[in-house]
Amino acid sequence: MPGVKKRKVAREAPAPAPAQESDVESSTPEQTQEPEAQEQEQEEGQSKTFKELGIIEQLCEACETMGYKAPTPIQRESIPLALKGRDLIGLAETGSGKTAAFALPILQALMEKPQPFFGLVLAPTRELAYQISKSFESLGASMGVRSCVIVGGMDMVSQSISLGKKPHIIVATPGRLLDHLENTKGFSLRNLKYLVMDEADRLLDMDFGPLLDKILKVLPRERRTFLFSATMSSKVESLQRASLSNPLRVSVSTSKYQTVSTLLQSYLFIPQKHKDLYLVYLLNEFAGQSTIIFTRTVNETQRLAFLLRALGFGAIPLHGQLSQSARLGALGKFRARSRNILVATDVAARGLDIPSVDVVLNFDLPGDSPSYVHRVGRTARAGKSGLAISFVAQYDVEVWLRIEGALGKKLKEYDCPKDEVMVLGENVAEAQRQAIMDMKDYNEKKGSRGKKFGGKRSRDEMDQEEG
């Protein structure tokens, strides 16, 4: 039966092949996009199901169970090529379905030739690693797929025991994986068949480059490699040249900083001292909706969580100085809607599986345009609509103009009646005083633990977001 499926893929895949080959030889993204346009229209008309992409029935049923009704653009473009055994570079905006785009071909290949340590996925953060592992286990449940998560902040011995059980898939952050490759007796990836580097631009932004080089040196040359990224920087280009063999590039973004069409974006130009007031006003306006508030620092994340709790909002913080169990617990509550407000540093901006976020509020602007796109990409996912509002204080104008320039458009100012906002002043001031006391207690309990974030990060700390 697997052989029949292979022949079916071979019949369906050739149509887009010439365009993709020219894509590899082309030196600029603009040249890449144009020859694909007509082929993509034909492909969209023909490949509307996972089965038509070449995915076997067993995995199609798993997709249906998980609620994947139809392939997303990145899945439509990537899966047929991956099933043909090609190395891939996938460029797509956040929320595009990249995990299934690489997980399904790997699982299909695993069914044909099952073996331990079949696939390795490298991810920049612990939360993303757990999410990817969960996707593999859910899609491969009928096959009995075993996945193992190897990340910092967790016990090395228990991880070594998990590796000793020889899972099919390892999902890891680079620092902890390298620790095991160097120190765990009997652990080797010399028979690895598939390597995935997910959120490659983020991996490199977090200074994992030297660790990736060391990992690549101990992996077999005869393997398939998939590199997925939201943007194609010079660092990602260098990583591609070092790790992929004659890859095909698949891009479903038309702009370096594209946001989805169902996302409504606007801004509020307000004094720095009134940001808390406007935040509380907006949360009252969006009461009951799932909201992520992004801040620049761990301290501000924690302060806002205390402030909002004092006002009766169900707010939970998410940042890199929380324990791993606390971070997973916060995400679990937010996903389950037992808490509808998540106050976060950029640890939550990339790749985390939060199915339905209605509103994103940039309480603090990010420092660059890619980070803005990744933040607002938490809403308006999978065809749903969403709203993103950014707070622009008097000191943020230059940064905001750069973001608008990268987006290629001027965004509208959000209509917020000042007199209604100012009415909240007394209650918010009282909550601010309470938050100050709560922060004092919090910092006293934390003690000297925060000092470790001031020095050079160890491998174990590199996969947490410092905020």
Swiss-Prot record:
<feature type="region of interest" description="Disordered">
    <location>
        <begin position="439"/>
        <end position="467"/>
    </location>
</feature>
<dbReference type="InterPro" id="IPR000629">
    <property type="entry name" value="RNA-helicase_DEAD-box_CS"/>
</dbReference>
<dbReference type="GO" id="GO:0003723">
    <property type="term" value="F:RNA binding"/>
</dbReference>
<comment type="function">
    <text>ATP-dependent rRNA helicase required for pre-ribosomal RNA processing. Involved in the maturation of the 35S-pre-rRNA and to its cleavage to mature 18S rRNA.</text>
</comment>
<dbReference type="InterPro" id="IPR027417">
    <property type="entry name" value="P-loop_NTPase"/>
</dbReference>
<feature type="region of interest" description="Disordered">
    <location>
        <begin position="1"/>
        <end position="48"/>
    </location>
</feature>
<dbReference type="GO" id="GO:0006364">
    <property type="term" value="P:rRNA processing"/>
</dbReference>
<comment type="subunit">
    <text>Interacts with the SSU processome.</text>
</comment>
<dbReference type="GO" id="GO:0005829">
    <property type="term" value="C:cytosol"/>
</dbReference>
<feature type="domain" description="Helicase ATP-binding">
    <location>
        <begin position="79"/>
        <end position="250"/>
    </location>
</feature>
<keyword id="KW-0694">RNA-binding</keyword>
<dbReference type="InterPro" id="IPR014014">
    <property type="entry name" value="RNA_helicase_DEAD_Q_motif"/>
</dbReference>
<dbReference type="InterPro" id="IPR050079">
    <property type="entry name" value="DEAD_box_RNA_helicase"/>
</dbReference>
<dbReference type="Pfam" id="PF00271">
    <property type="entry name" value="Helicase_C"/>
</dbReference>
<keyword id="KW-0347">Helicase</keyword>
<dbReference type="InterPro" id="IPR001650">
    <property type="entry name" value="Helicase_C-like"/>
</dbReference>
<protein>
    <recommendedName>
        <fullName>ATP-dependent rRNA helicase rrp3</fullName>
        <ecNumber>3.6.4.13</ecNumber>
    </recommendedName>
</protein>
<keyword id="KW-0698">rRNA processing</keyword>
<feature type="short sequence motif" description="DEAD box">
    <location>
        <begin position="198"/>
        <end position="201"/>
    </location>
</feature>
<keyword id="KW-0547">Nucleotide-binding</keyword>
<dbReference type="Pfam" id="PF00270">
    <property type="entry name" value="DEAD"/>
</dbReference>
<dbReference type="GO" id="GO:0016887">
    <property type="term" value="F:ATP hydrolysis activity"/>
</dbReference>
<keyword id="KW-0539">Nucleus</keyword>
<feature type="short sequence motif" description="Q motif">
    <location>
        <begin position="48"/>
        <end position="76"/>
    </location>
</feature>
<dbReference type="GO" id="GO:0003724">
    <property type="term" value="F:RNA helicase activity"/>
</dbReference>
<dbReference type="InterPro" id="IPR011545">
    <property type="entry name" value="DEAD/DEAH_box_helicase_dom"/>
</dbReference>
<keyword id="KW-0378">Hydrolase</keyword>
<dbReference type="GO" id="GO:0005634">
    <property type="term" value="C:nucleus"/>
</dbReference>
<dbReference type="InterPro" id="IPR044765">
    <property type="entry name" value="DDX47/Rrp3_DEADc"/>
</dbReference>
<dbReference type="GO" id="GO:0005524">
    <property type="term" value="F:ATP binding"/>
</dbReference>
<dbReference type="InterPro" id="IPR014001">
    <property type="entry name" value="Helicase_ATP-bd"/>
</dbReference>
<feature type="domain" description="Helicase C-terminal">
    <location>
        <begin position="262"/>
        <end position="422"/>
    </location>
</feature>
<comment type="similarity">
    <text>Belongs to the DEAD box helicase family. DDX47/RRP3 subfamily.</text>
</comment>
<feature type="binding site">
    <location>
        <begin position="92"/>
        <end position="99"/>
    </location>
    <ligand>
        <name>ATP</name>
    </ligand>
</feature>
<keyword id="KW-0690">Ribosome biogenesis</keyword>
<keyword id="KW-0067">ATP-binding</keyword>
